[in-house]
């Protein structure tokens, strides 16, 4: 059996950091994740997904992410229940994050950075040397930016 979730979205409000009686940090936040299609009116819809993260990553989330920050979450789905104030059973489904990636740099105003946000250049090439991939990290961290230059793709290299 497998219970694995990977999400990318924006925080709907600042994370809430609390500590258990044993002193363990826990942060909760809601991630707005766009659906991959538009509705009948041509509008992009989003799902609002509750997330929880524990220990040191919880403190990092609280310190570096804020409302509107772009984040990637890798974790699992968990359903729990409790008795509400009115005596009715309340069910909560949330994502327990095993890791949270900060997908924007501080320069973009998001308040966080990725763990691999160096200003380096990486070159990759395949065995037959017919094509190569060059990723240049620009100042804004967009590794896909090419300053409007045409992309050189050999049709023989496409899988379709």
UniProtKB/Swiss-Prot annotation:
GO molecular function (one): single-stranded DNA binding
InterPro entries to which the protein is assigned, alphabetical: NA-bd_OB-fold, Primosome_PriB/ssb, ssDNA-bd
Domain of life from the UniProt record: Bacteria
PROSITE patterns membership: SSB
Alphabetized Gene3D superfamilies for the sequence: Nucleic acid-binding proteins
SUPFAM superfamilies to which the protein is assigned, alphabetical: Nucleic acid-binding proteins (SSF50249)
Keywords assigned by UniProt, alphabetized: DNA-binding
Chain spans, region Disordered: 106-160
GO cellular component: nucleoid
Domain SSB: 2-104
Residues spanning the membrane: none
BP-aspect Gene Ontology terms: DNA replication
Classification via Pfam families: SSB
Chain intervals with Polar residues compositional bias: 106-133
HAMAP family: SSB
Assembly: Homotetramer.
NCBIfam families: ssb
Protein name: Single-stranded DNA-binding protein 3
Originating organism: Listeria innocua serovar 6a (strain ATCC BAA-680 / CLIP 11262)
Name of the gene: ssb3
